[in-house]
Curated annotation (Swiss-Prot):
Phosphorylated. Phosphorylation may regulate its interaction with RAN-GTP. GO terms for biological process: erythrocyte enucleation; erythrocyte maturation; nuclear membrane organization. PANTHER family: AT07567P-RELATED, NUCLEAR ENVELOPE INTEGRAL MEMBRANE PROTEIN 1. Residues 415-437 are annotated as: Disordered. The lineage of its organism: Eukaryota, Metazoa, Chordata, Craniata, Vertebrata. Residues 1-44 form the signal peptide. Coiled coil: none annotated. The transmembrane domains are required and sufficient for its oligomerization. It comes from Mus musculus. Disruption phenotype: Mutants are viable and generally healthy although anemic. Most females are sterile or severely subfertile while males are fertile. Marked reduction in the number of primordial follicles, indicating a reduced ovarian reserve, and oocytes have reduced nuclear envelope stiffness. Mice show peripheral blood defects, anemia in neonates, ineffective erythropoiesis, splenomegaly, and stress erythropoiesis. The gene is Nemp1. This is Nuclear envelope integral membrane protein 1.
Length: 437
């Protein structure tokens, strides 16, 4: 009897000749296949320990389940539920969804057999539980005897999630500034070179490989192995720094300098399209970090929508302000223009005259001016040539005539005429000349 199923094995071990294989070895093989199939089909009872938000100490392999009964609230957006397994020696931890999957782990199968060798063996590991996950189960297997371990369930505010959210918010709102910053360009290039140096080497090797070459299979395996090494290093970074800090520091300095040299050779981005692509990439990365750092999906979606609206809010606000100004100008009374005083009129006339004369000199000295055609149309070519060279544009005689007509003498004459006309009035009229002030 195996799992409630009767197995008949007489045909594999009974006497008499059999045609299942040479030397009767096929009968034993058939027996093993039947027994293995029955073991896979059979079901075993699983002893499961229900976890609470506390600590449990064990000294044997055991299965655990945690049932989340609390409904997440809006203030739990950065709350994380973790199951920590801390042991004195190496243990293997497997996470599944429910008890049925735990029963499948207890049954023999080829997949479970090979996957047991691929799973990491750690003495301190964390299992994250989603806030909306109703149940999470895990299996702790002891590798060595005399191993003790503790299983702790915690529900607390995670500052890492908050920092990731701030990083995503910064990338989204400052992506256009960061894409044009040289400091961001060099720091990002050095960081990528330090973290993914092995991936970059494999990528450079693939550039020299011929197309349709079998070596691409090895390169794909190299990519996967490199990603696995990066993940493994980050998980054990603290231990690596404690034991091999001098090698790690030498690696960071060497690869960082090489990455800086490569970035310096190519220089920051100058093409506007490339800058736009980098900006959009940073903004999408920021939105992804914001969504992944918030544990409640609908709150994360709402915050992303608010961020998108806020980012593009300047355009509708600018349009509304310009529309409001146009409406105010259309509905309001026209404001009469302010008239210039005599002093302002005189100053403006002098400034504009000098400006126009200078522009005329520049035009006459430019290749666009036809000198012979201009000279043929004027009465005094020498005077025109002196003016182009910087001489005054009026002769002394013209200045004298202008002063007699519009200068101080003409002003006194006008004042005398006005005084004689107003002698019979009761109150005399005084005329103020702004040219004298």
């Amino acid at each position: 009897m195996a799992g409630g199923i009767k197995v008949s094995v007489w045909s594999a071990v009974g006497p008499g000749p059999r045609c299942w294989g040479a030397g009767g070895g096929g009968g034993a093989t058939w027996l093993l296949l039947v027994v293995a199939g029955c073991v896979v089909c059979g079901s075993a009872d699983v002893n499961v320990v229900m976890l609470q938000e506390s600590q449990v100490d064990m000294n044997s392999s055991q299965q655990f389940c945690y049932k989340n009964v609390l409904i997440p609230k809006w203030h739990d957006i950065w709350t994380r539920i973790q199951v920590r397994v801390n042991s004195s020696k190496l243990v293997r931890v497997t996470q599944v969804d429910n008890e049925e999957k735990l029963k499948e782990l207890e049954q023999f199968s080829i997949w479970n057999f090979f996957s047991s060798f691929l799973k990491e063996k750690l003495n301190d590991t964390y299992v994250n539980v989603g806030l909306y996950s109703t149940k999470t189960c895990l299996k702790v297997e002891m590798i060595e005897k005399d191993t003790t371990y503790s299983v702790t369930v915690t529900r607390r505010f995670d500052p890492k999630l908050f920092l990731v959210f701030l990083l995503g918010l910064t990338l989204f709102f400052c992506g256009d500034l960061l894409s044009r910053s040289q400091i961001f360009y060099y720091s990002t290039g050095m960081s990528v070179g330090i973290v993914a140096s092995l991936l970059i080497v494999i990528f450079m090797i693939s550039k020299f490989m011929p197309k349709r070459s079998p070596i691409y299979v090895i390169l794909v395996g190299g990519w996967s192995f490199s990603l696995y090494l990066i993940q493994l290093v980050f998980k054990n970074l603290q231990e690596i720094w404690r034991s091999y800090w001098h090698y790690l520091l030498s690696y960071i300095l060497t690869v960082g300098f090489m990455s800086f040299a490569v970035c310096y050779k190519y220089g920051p981005l100058e093409n506007e399209r490339s800058i736009n692509l980098l900006t959009w990439t940073l903004q999408l990365l920021g939105l992804g970090l914001m969504y992944s750092s918030i544990q409640i999906p609908h709150v994360a979606f709402a915050l992303i929508v608010i961020a998108l609206c806020t980012k593009n809010l300047e355009y509708p606000i600018h349009w509304l302000c310009s529309t409001y100004r146009r409406m105010c100008k259309a509905s309001g009374k026209p404001v009469p223009p302010r008239l210039l005083t005599e002093e302002e009129y005189r100053i403006q006339g002098e400034v504009e005259t000098q400006k126009a004369l200078q522009e005329l000199r520049e035009f006459c000295n430019s290749p666009e001016c036809s000198a012979w055609k201009t000279i043929s149309r004027i009465q005094s070519p020498k005077r025109f040539a002196d003016f182009v060279e910087g001489s005054f544009h009026l002769t002394p005689n013209e200045v004298s005539v202008h002063e007699q007509e519009y200068g101080l003498g003409s002003i006194f004459t006008q004042d005398e005429e006005l005084s004689s006309e107003e002698e019979g009035s009761e109150y005399p009229t005084f005329t103020q000349n702004n040219f004298l002030t």
